[in-house]
Amino acid sequence: MKIRLDQYLVQHGLIQSRERAKAMIMSGVVFVNEQKVDKAGEMIKEDAKVEVRGHDIGYVSRGGLKLEKAMQCFPLTPKGKVCMDIGASTGGFTDCMLQNGAVKVYAVDVGYGQLAWSLRTDERVVNMERTNIRNVTLDQLAEPIEFFSVDVSFISLHHIFPVVQAITTPDAMGVCLVKPQFEAGREKVGKNGVVRDPATHREVLHNAMGYAAANGFKVCGLDFSPVKGPEGNIEYLMFVQKSDEPGALDDSVAEQVVASSHSTLDR
């Protein structure tokens, strides 16, 4: 059985809308069985290997697609809010926040010179490069953060949540990218830094939800990232909000999300 390529991308959670799917296909960043396809109406087999590559996706990097999916799946928006992009890198999340109405974005990253020029020169962006989020305090900011995203590498969310708790407003909400390769024990990380075991993914999500709850956040939603991380790691989106009643979702939710992620992305 065959299906239109643009329809396939939406149905499998790789892109959020047919309009965006058509634009990305036409831009030449969609590959089917290792071959570039630039026609949205191309009919492909259901079991074809489909990948979205490159950065011509409406944002300065793929991070924008991750936040875009989170906003589609969860009741959250940066519109009218002071935001922070933790682990900004080139600024995909920052770009998505601005395109969706953020009034200011603090772009935080330990690196230097990575933030896209279009964002470096945007007066709504506060470029906090060469900055370790673990050292950031409220005194360094003009105001507390209302909306945040976390996309960090080589560090666990266990170390991020105490800082986020201290610099955010009482009703702050955010999206955290949960990366099994940086959350799992070293013995559970496979060749090339890839974590493939669904059981490890479930354990990682359970722990990540615990870190959030322990720091005054309620976990309101889980889903998987529409694009894999480096080396092909499946990663997850966790929607959290500060709450007087912090807590995690039932582990059965994590189990369902992990199963869905593998059936969709490990094709």
For the regions a language model picked out, list residue spans one by one.
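A short glycine-rich, Lys/Arg-flanked "PGG" loop and its adjoining helix->strand segment in the class I
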Residues: H158-V175
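Flexible, glycine-/basic-rich loop-and-beta segments that form/coincide
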Residues: I234-R267
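Short, glycine-/aromatic-enriched active-site segment of Class I SAM-dependent methyltransferases
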Residues: P180-D197
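Conserved class I S-adenosyl-L-methionine
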Residues: K79-S89
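Glycine-rich SAM-binding Motif I of class I
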Residues: G91-G92, G113
